[in-house]
Amino acid sequence: SVAYTDSIPLVAALLKPVANLVGGTFQYMGWFTLVCFALQGGFGALLAGLFLPGCAAPLAADLLFVTSPVLFERVFRHTSLGAQFFVLAALYFYFAARRKGQYASRGLFALNVLAVGIHPYFLPMTYAITLALLLEYALHNRQLAGPGLYLAANFGGTALLGWALGLLYGSASSGGQALYGYFCMNLNALWNPVGVNGVLYSRVLPAQNQVYGNYDAFAYPGLGVLIALPIAVVLLRRQLGGMLRRHWALACCCAVLTVFAISNVITANGATLATLPLPASLIKLFSIFRSSGRLFWPIYYLLMLLTLVGLARLKGRWLLAGAALLAVVQVWDVSPGMVQRSAAMLQAMQTDAFPTEMESDFWQAAQQYTAVVSMDEIQDDALHLALFAADNGMTTNDPFAARYDETALAAQRETLLAELAAGTVREDTLYLFAEEGAFLQAVEPVKDNAWCGRVTSTDGTCSWYVIAPGLQGQ
């Protein structure tokens, strides 16, 4: 399913008719990124407006959200996760509902349903915020039925869209060797300004060491936030206790998300402080969200929001001046990373991002097939194989997916290998092998019915053993 390819499945499904209409590939990633920036700014301003008076101060403070290093780090390299506005919107609907004394937020319902169609990693975040709202309402008003039915409706809507997009087919049991704990959040994440490929989001703070997959838990909030946050805590020192009591469920959910983000593999700078033993069953369960560091994002934005709540202690011109100063320091600090990401994007636009290695006479002839199948392993060059299949309208069992059904894949390969052992080839199928031994074992019964041999990429970095029915003698 496209749902496992980080291709923003809901948008892909809605725009497929457009691709058919224009007679080819319709590139929607840029449009989606534009929408992400617009909605990040919109919901950021709405959220800031709940705590800051007037228009000027919330708009100035909104720069914290629209220049969020996490936003820029994601939209330019992992577009589906650029929908950071889901977290801001969930927080806005939470606080708006709390102020109205409501629990049945239409906005949260929409977010919980739509999140599964954008990226499943947003689900635990939006649902955690929803659960906090429901728990606080239920215990304060001693009503369980209404919040329970509302939560059930949310689950139902999420499951329905997930089913429609193919997320509920199979088990999606495999996604590589890395399990829960590998992509954990380093304890230095809040003051480590280095992103992927060494992109530095600070003019002041140096890059800190990381281990394992800490890079995926990038959570630098910016120097403006880091300076303003302790000031806000001091200004709010008498109100913090009351805030935590009023929003106790949100605080508990944030604590759970933070612990999950840090994981059982506790890292600090370049060291692993401890690896807490967990049952294999829990590791397998938690590996559904193996990139655990991402689940810190609600806390990340709440820390930004806390600086604005502290800022609200200022009055009149001091408030606007404080908001403007905070925004200026923030943008000044994080702008190098923004410039680097922009430059990398411009450079990528000047060259073919994924130059094909499949330009030989063999690959020209192979365009006649309707299916290309990987027979023994997920291929090292899975991306180019997936693009080759897509460009030529082929099906493939090696689609460069984030997750795949390991059991179904093994069953399909067993069926295909049994057919080859019986001397039967599918004339519309190109068979690929990564291992020479597996290829030699499978090829003997069908060597007279297909071209069989080794094909190397144009640059010599990749090679495949192939069984190509109908190409013998060519």
Task: Indicate where each model-derived feature is located.
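Membrane-interface coil-to-helix junctions
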Residues: S1-Q40, S68-P69, H78, P193-N197
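Signature aromatic-anchored transmembrane alpha helix within multi-pass, membrane-resident enzymes
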Residues: A152-G156, C254-A255, L305, L311-V339
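Membrane-interface helix-loop junctions at the exits of transmembrane helices
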Residues: L59-R77, L161-S171, A189-S202, A251-I288, ...
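Membrane-embedded helix bundles of polyisoprenyl
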Residues: L34, A38-L50, A56-R98, A104-Y137, ...
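Extracytoplasmic
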Residues: V334-Q474
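Hydrophobic alpha-helical membrane-interfacial segments at the cytosolic entry of transmembrane helices
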Residues: R142-L167, Q177-Y182, N186, A249-V256
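Periplasmic/ER-lumenal interhelical loops and adjacent helix-loop junctions
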Residues: L161-V234
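Perimembrane helix-loop-helix junctions
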Residues: P124-G156, A232-G242
